[in-house]
Design a protein with these regions (language model features):
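Non-catalytic accessory segments flanking enzyme active sites
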Residues: 1-33, 56-58, 63-64, 105, ...
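Short secondary-structure boundary/capping elements
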Residues: 3, 33, 53, 94, ...
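Structural beta-strand/beta-sheet cores of well-ordered domains, especially the beta-sheet scaffolds
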Residues: 7, 19, 37, 64-66, ...
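Hydrophobic residues at beta-strand termini and immediately following loops
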Residues: 9-11, 41, 71, 233
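A structure-centric signal for secondary-structure junctions around beta-strands
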Residues: 18, 34-35, 186, 227
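Short hydrophobic segments within beta-strands
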Residues: 24, 40-41, 120, 192
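Short substrate-entry loop that stabilizes the transition state in hydrolases
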Residues: 29-35, 40-80
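Active-site-proximal cap/loop segments of hydrolase catalytic domains
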Residues: 70-274
Length: 274
């Protein structure tokens, strides 16, 4: 049994484009009992939430009481070439605008609590989460998994470097690189990365972590304390696929979101020894 229900939602952006999404809701969500919202951004970027995957499972978060928004912004597949072209080479523009537009539409619903929201994504979705962090403080927390951070550094180090050089010129990369906005970040972030990730090398996560602690608006204090968190898997790849590690992944995400969005503590996995 699913712990909730699934709805199709959509909005129309300023350029007249329709942005579709799925919204997974707990059964108890209502105008009398609005629920927190988790915006979950898919990877790819040439991808879609139309395909089911056990690894990126919204129902686990719905079971914890969140509504989970699964949007298909510009660059998503299944909506024609023009929809892809809207975001081609401009990752931080149309895709970001689409994500904010569909979020605006959903938080206007009476069954959603617009004061308790978070954003999350992996790979390209993590890139977008990083971009969101540097462009808005509307979310209480952001989770970024296996994410692109400094695009000038990423391009020549990924195992898909040949593809990347066809996707973006050096100038495009710098125009769309999240690391240039680190000084604007005032939202607590959970950074997750696997050391054996060759698609988005670990250097992206390490640099993001260092720059959050040194240059964001929530830097580490004299004792090294900061609301930002880093979950590191020394023997995992781009997805984090070992079942015990996938379990830890979800438990740490739940802990971080509960603290930052819901305002209470959930225990961390015993395996972390914390």
């Amino acid at each position: 049994m699913h712990p909730g229900r699934l709805e199709r939602v959509a909005t129309t952006t300023a350029d007249g484009s329709r942005v579709p999404a799925y919204l997974a809701l707990p059964d108890h969500a209502s105008g009398d009992q609005p629920v927190p919202l988790l915006l979950w951004i898919h990877g790819g970027p040439l991808n879609s939430w139309n395909a089911w995957t056990w690894r990126w499972n919204p129902w686990l978060m719905v079971a914890k009481g969140y509504a989970v928004l699964l949007p298909d912004p510009a660059l998503s597949t299944g909506y024609g070439q023009d929809f892809i072209q809207r975001g081609w080479g401009e990752w931080g523009k149309r895709p970001f605008e689409d994500l904010m537009a569909i979020t605006d539409a959903v938080v206007a619903r009476p069954d959603i609590d617009e004061t308790r929201t978070a954003a999350m994504g992996g790979s390209f979705g993590g890139y977008m989460a990083n971009w969101v962090a540097g462009k808005t403080d509307r979310f209480k927390a952001i989770v970024t998994h296996a994410s692109l951070w400094a695009l000038d550094q990423f391009g020549p180090t990924t195992d898909a470097a040949q593809y990347w050089l066809k996707e973006m010129t050096a100038e495009m990369a710098m125009e769309n690189s999240p690391h240039l906005n680190v000084g604007n970040i005032k939202t607590p972030m959970l950074v997750i990365h696997g050391d054996k990730d060759y698609r988005v090398p670990i250097g992206e996560g390490l640099r993001l972590w260092y720059e959050l602690l040194s240059s964001s608006q929530l830097p580490a204090d004299g004792n090294g304390h900061s609301p930002h968190r880093f979950l590191y898997f020394p023997d995992e790849n781009h997805w984090v696929l070992q079942p015990r590690h996938t379990k830890i992944w979800y438990e740490v995400v739940e802990h971080f979101l509960a603290k930052q969005v819901l305002g209470f503590d959930v225990e961390l996995p015993e395996e972390l020894g914390l």
